[in-house]
Amino acid sequence: MSKFTSRELRARRHRRLRGQLSGTPERPRLNVFRSGLNIYAQVIDDLAGHTLVSASTIDTELRGSLGEQRKLEQAHSVGKAVAERARAAGITKVVFDRGGYKYHGRVKAVAEGAREGGLEF
């Protein structure tokens, strides 16, 4: 039996990744967080410590269009939305931060949606 829960292991992976990843004003960090029900994506400038743009499944703008979509499809829509907002803010290149999650499922769907929306990783 493992000494750590899966949540603790994810947090450890995320801390390890954050030591290697850093968002700059020229190439900010696209961070993904997923809960059991929702998914969140933020574009962050780590040097200034500011969130530049964000999108999530709880946004009022997206909530109506998500409707009866499955969580995987919702994640794809969130990726597209964050990419559109980033491009409107003049951001075209980002560093992808998977947040310690496996690059699979909803995290992968956010990344693919962001790529479709025009962001370069």
Curated annotation (Swiss-Prot):
Organism name: Herpetosiphon aurantiacus (strain ATCC 23779 / DSM 785 / 114-95)
Molecular function as annotated in GO: 5S rRNA binding; structural constituent of ribosome
Protein name, per record: Large ribosomal subunit protein uL18
Gene3D superfamilies recorded: 3.30.420.100
Top-level division of the source organism's lineage: Bacteria
Signal peptide start-end: none
Single biological process term from Gene Ontology: translation
Family the entry assigns: Belongs to the universal ribosomal protein uL18 family.
Cellular component terms per the entry's GO annotation: cytosolic large ribosomal subunit
